[in-house]
Amino acid sequence: MSKPAILKASDITDELRDEIFGISVQAVEQFQLEREVAAYIKKELDSKHGQTWHVIVGKNFGSYVTHEKGHFIYFYIGPLAFLVFKTA
């Protein structure tokens, strides 16, 4: 049974949020390396919602990013932090 996603910050729709949570849970269940988890999420989002999505997954990182309005989310699944955003 997977852990629930804990939202920290977001400016996306509830529908897109739920989709990203679902894709991310699938990635965590399917892959062990953080790099592979991030790559899976990025490829899914690029395919379904157009390019260019960026995905950072890890336990310890800082960030300061510019993103398209309505395309940013930061959340946790267990000990892993997920920063997902789209740029033009």
UniProtKB/Swiss-Prot annotation:
Pfam families: Dynein_light (PF01221). Its main location: cytoplasm. It is found in: Cytoplasm, Cytoskeleton; Nucleus, Nuclear pore complex. GO terms for biological process: establishment of mitotic spindle localization; mRNA transport; nuclear migration along microtubule; nuclear pore complex assembly; protein transport. One of its GO terms (molecular function) is plus-end-directed microtubule motor activity. Disulfide bonds: none annotated. Keywords: Cytoplasm, Cytoskeleton, Dynein, Microtubule, Motor protein, mRNA transport, Nuclear pore complex, Nucleus, Protein transport, Translocation, Transport. Acts as one of several non-catalytic accessory components of the cytoplasmic dynein complex that are thought to be involved in linking dynein to cargos and to adapter proteins that regulate dynein function. Cytoplasmic dynein 1 acts as a motor for the intracellular retrograde motility of vesicles and organelles along microtubules. May play a role in changing or maintaining the spatial distribution of cytoskeletal structures. Also a component of the nuclear pore complex. Homodimer. Cytoplasmic dynein consists of two catalytic heavy chains (HCs) and a number of non-catalytic subunits which present intermediate chains (ICs), light intermediate chains (LICs) and light chains (LCs). Component of the nuclear pore complex (NPC). NPC constitutes the exclusive means of nucleocytoplasmic transport. NPCs allow the passive diffusion of ions and small molecules and the active, nuclear transport receptor-mediated bidirectional transport of macromolecules such as proteins, RNAs, ribonucleoparticles (RNPs), and ribosomal subunits across the nuclear envelope. This is Dynein light chain 1, cytoplasmic. It comes from Eremothecium gossypii (strain ATCC 10895 / CBS 109.51 / FGSC 9923 / NRRL Y-1056). The gene is DYN2.
